[in-house]
């Protein structure tokens, strides 16, 4: 059975994950990031279709997001959390992933997903972006569906930009 659920993401999106580590690990940015996440969660807390809170997009990981995740879990412990950029760390300290419920990736191959699941992956696996729906981009879904259906620790995925961006003419 397929269904449509929403992963709600705040507007913290830097498109340069590895280069944003100084922001993600800088306590001076905690309030700025927390403010965006707080506004998103409070705005959409009563929307039943929202099943996952996302901390943002491609913006590295550090103390700023650890604090934001702690706030989200204290405010709404019922919904799941994910942050794909949690993998982008500087390796200089031990990171806290305790408030992340899901391990998420963008556009992984089937073999990459299998490697995580068959290895020491300790969180359910979800594709936070896949099947980019631009032009004739959305393809190969059947292979992903078969993989999801055959592995209990996968949660499916979220189609990125669920619409074509072609120009509409009358």
Set out the residue ranges of the language-model regions.
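Substrate-binding/catalytic cleft of secreted carbohydrate-active enzymes
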Residues: 3, 7-170
């Amino acid at each position: 059975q397929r269904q449509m659920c929403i992963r709600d993401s705040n507007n913290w999106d830097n498109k340069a994950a590895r280069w944003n580590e100084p922001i993600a690990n800088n306590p001076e940015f905690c309030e700025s990031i927390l403010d965006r996440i707080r506004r998103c969660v409070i705005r959409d807390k009563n929307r039943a279709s929202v099943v996952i809170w996302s901390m943002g997009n491609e913006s590295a990981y550090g103390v700023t997001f650890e604090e934001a995740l702690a706030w989200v879990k204290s405010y709404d412990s019922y919904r799941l959390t994910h942050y794909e950029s949690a993998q982008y760390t500087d390796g200089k300290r031990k990171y806290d992933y305790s408030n992340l419920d899901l391990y998420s990736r963008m556009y992984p191959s089937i073999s990459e997903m299998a490697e995580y699941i068959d290895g020491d992956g300790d969180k359910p696996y979800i594709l936070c972006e896949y099947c980019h729906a631009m032009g004739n981009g959305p393809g190969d879904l059947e292979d992903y569906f078969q993989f999801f259906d055959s592995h209990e620790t996968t949660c499916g995925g979220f189609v990125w930009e669920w619409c074509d961006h072609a120009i509409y003419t009358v």
